[in-house]
Amino acid sequence: RTLKAKIMAEKNYAFYPGCSSQKGASAANYLTSVNAVCNKLALRLTAIPDWNCCGASISYAGGSELSRQVLNARNLALAEKHLPGQDVVATCAACWLAARETREQLVASEPLRADANEALEVAGLEYQGKAKVRHMVEVLIEDLGLEALSKPVVKALDGLKIAGYVG
């Protein structure tokens, strides 16, 4: 491995597993795959303690935009509190998008962040906007690189038809 890949591979990440990755859920196999890949590449994912649903589908249930933002802000605040300095990594595209959009909106708007923090205060939390939100694919490509990813391959999957998981 290159020095950059070695250094980045030893980095820890605050992991947001998401509801669909839980046992018996639609993407439980996805979590199994992510864990196997991270173990092989020596990436350390630490689940955000007491994480909650990202609220990606809350609008369908009549929830407000602020409710969805507070759900994500809570996860990000928990990551900042318990896993400081670590990027938040999600594997589900819907979870990643919900968390990333919330971060962007709360960082850009002090009044919106104040509203979210007022709700979080009940749980003794405050969102500060420090944690960066990233997708697992981003981490693999940007932090490790394609060359480092190809080295541990035992059997190439050339010609295999695959489908992405969209959340």
Mark where each language-model region is.
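Iron-sulfur cluster-binding electron-transfer modules in prokaryotic oxidoreductases
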Residues: 3-167
